[in-house]
């Protein structure tokens, strides 16, 4: 019988453990048990002035004595027999004030936290759940290690400036072993159109133009525009666009690149595509390309966002972290602690404390209050301003945001463990399926995204098995107003229908090969990811003016910042990591850890606010 993600009891566990110095090759528990609220279930021993469990073969981060600098290599995602204490809380009251509290430990929040910690700030991350990562977390069942969200990982290359995950890990002394994916996605589209997006751009271009030779020039020009934007972005040092000293410095160093980005800022991918391409089927293909990026078609997808993804997949490529996506958040959390900051789990923030118009702290579900100079919310803006802030009226800027953007639908997720022999030996890792009608692209359950991470990393599943991770859009309204029995029955029916479609299109015999099935609905994602309606993120209400209306990290409330996919530049791994970098830089400047000009700050923030009114 299928169950929702996390709806069955979890093993006591799932904390990241890494070696935290070169003193020993044994694996140590972080020497900050109060901060983590950890209670060891194993005997502990004393050595080198630190408490740690007796040596265990965790195999998470490995440190070599032969090198002066730690060489962290992720071997696998592991469970460790630890449990979290819900009644332990750090820094209660005003006896200890942090430089920043980060609400939530998604990738955006963790990047912001670690970047601040590296700059010297004292940061506390508060996570509602048992492990870090949010949508980039993981869970384990019966020997399978499942990624909670996407398994398509951008930003992991070793070159350029958009390899933001690599940079974030390196900043805190971690490096993860990755497996290059020879392709990004295999499209299976109406009229039996099949397009494989190869890692090498020239191979992808050749494949696409072989299907549409009459549009070769138009395809070349559209993707050429994408490369122009990507190359401009990739040449810049990426920091906060709300910090004028940095912004003007970049403009004087790279004026043409900055002007290129300014030109494309208010434009959408679909409009650019239509300048060069006339064939409606090619335009529909570009819609599908953009839908994966933004959950909307190309006419509603900002050109800058499309360019980041459509080019980085060839420039840096898709690289899967060995052991699973959950290792990214665990490594960042480990690095945060190594920098002297803290992370606390089972810490459910219920409200942000505002005094005299300034955000000064947070109140937890257990009534405890923790204070900081700055509060960074990694929740969506709907959760931040609709639930965490207890105000009668929305700030004007947030009111404008909610007029321009609505909550994108959530999704139905199906995690399968299947017998290996059901998949052909040359199966690609990622697939996008839209069988019959292009008009179903944005319809709930219309298209299916499928990842098979065990094609790249077989350690994620027991021998002789594969993992299939299936996504399709779904609205929370479809799952409300029914009894638990009807809810479970509907989950089973909808999941079986999706699986049957994949069986018919890709993998005959799929249904009978299933050894494990778990189904998550929008209600599941709302509960465990703490996202309003389980939303995937913001989507434009109408046709947007590119990214012009997307807010940055500062808010109308002094001392409160937002980070994540409802901030510039939006959804996706690169985008939220970029948001984290920008947020950390702006907060660091406000803390006096980076250069700052109060007069220029005020002028720039007013100017940016005015630009957003033009959207």
Swiss-Prot record:
Keyword Isomerase carried by entry: yes
Localization, UniProt: Plastid, Chloroplast membrane
EC number: 5.2.1.13
Membrane topology: Peripheral membrane protein
Matching InterPro entries: Amino_oxidase, CrtISO, CrtISO-like, FAD/NAD-bd_sf
Transit peptide start and end: 1-62
Root EC class: isomerase
Entry GO terms, CC: chloroplast membrane
Catalytic activity annotation: 7,7',9,9'-tetra-cis-lycopene = all-trans-lycopene
Single GO BP term: carotenoid biosynthetic process
Keyword Ligase: no
Molecular function via GO: carotenoid isomerase activity; oxidoreductase activity
Pathway this chain belongs to: Carotenoid biosynthesis; lycopene biosynthesis
Cofactor(s) essential for the protein: NAD(+); NADP(+); FAD
Keyword annotations: Carotenoid biosynthesis, Chloroplast, FAD, Flavoprotein, Isomerase, Membrane, NAD, NADP, Plastid, Transit peptide
NCBIfam families, A to Z: carot_isom (TIGR02730)
PANTHER family tied to this protein: PROLYCOPENE ISOMERASE, CHLOROPLASTIC, PTHR46313
Assigned protein family: Belongs to the carotenoid/retinoid oxidoreductase family. CrtISO subfamily.
Function recorded in the entry: Carotene cis-trans-isomerase that converts 7,9,9'-tri-cis-neurosporene to 9'-cis-neurosporene and 7,9,9',7'-tetra-cis-lycopene (also known as prolycopene) into all-trans-lycopene. Isomerization requires redox-active components, suggesting that isomerization is achieved by a reversible redox reaction acting at specific double bonds. Isomerizes adjacent cis-double bonds at C7 and C9 pairwise into the trans-configuration, but is incapable of isomerizing single cis-double bonds at C9 and C9'.
Name under which the protein is recorded: Prolycopene isomerase, chloroplastic
Organism of derivation: Daucus carota (Wild carrot)
Lineage: Eukaryota, Viridiplantae, Streptophyta, Embryophyta, Tracheophyta
